[in-house]
């Protein structure tokens, strides 16, 4: 990973939040603009029965992008629901006593611009985790009509 300096005056985390900061590897301005995207995947590790864990779980919430005034440095603010929504398939017939822990992600995780000029700064609830993916596309292709 690259080491970009955190020079912009990012806000402090609120008392019920934490701030996560990490750097992205430089890919070149053109490639970062045209080919790369960052997907922030916030969520929580929840304890649930084996039956619930076998179902698809999601959290509602949002990711809002903001900019440090006068700097142009982006940062993100995550809001997450406390309770997960889930499919309701009965998978195991036993009594649901056995518990497991499972990462449950925000249901809609948009792709945001990739930039190595500034650190990625994300504010999220203290009990949440942040995972991320980096997406890379190839050359643009032209669709043709028949």
Curated annotation (Swiss-Prot):
One GO MF term attached to the UniProt entry: serine-type endopeptidase inhibitor activity
Domain of life per record: Eukaryota
InterPro entries (alphabetical): Ecotin_sf (IPR036198), Prot_inh_ecotin (IPR005658)
Family that this chain belongs to: Belongs to the protease inhibitor I11 (ecotin) family.
PANTHER family, sorted: ECOTIN, PTHR35890
Protein name: Ecotin-like protein 1
Organism of derivation: Leishmania braziliensis
Underlying gene: ISP1
């Amino acid at each position: 990973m690259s080491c970009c300096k955190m020079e912009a005056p990012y806000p402090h985390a609120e008392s019920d939040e934490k701030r996560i900061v990490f750097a992205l590897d430089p890919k070149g301005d053109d490639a970062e603009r045209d080919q790369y995207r960052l997907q922030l995947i916030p969520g929580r590790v929840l304890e649930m029965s084996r039956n619930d864990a076998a179902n698809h779980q999601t959290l509602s919430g949002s990711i809002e992008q903001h900019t440090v005034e006068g700097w142009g440095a982006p940062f993100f603010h995550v809001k997450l629901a406390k309770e997960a929504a889930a499919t309701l398939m009965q998978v195991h017939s036993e009594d649901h006593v056995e518990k497991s822990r499972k990462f449950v992600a925000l249901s809609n995780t948009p792709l945001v611009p990739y930039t190595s000029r500034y650190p990625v700064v994300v504010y999220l609830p203290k009990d949440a985790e942040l995972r991320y993916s980096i997406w890379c596309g190839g050359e643009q292709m032209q669709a043709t009509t028949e």
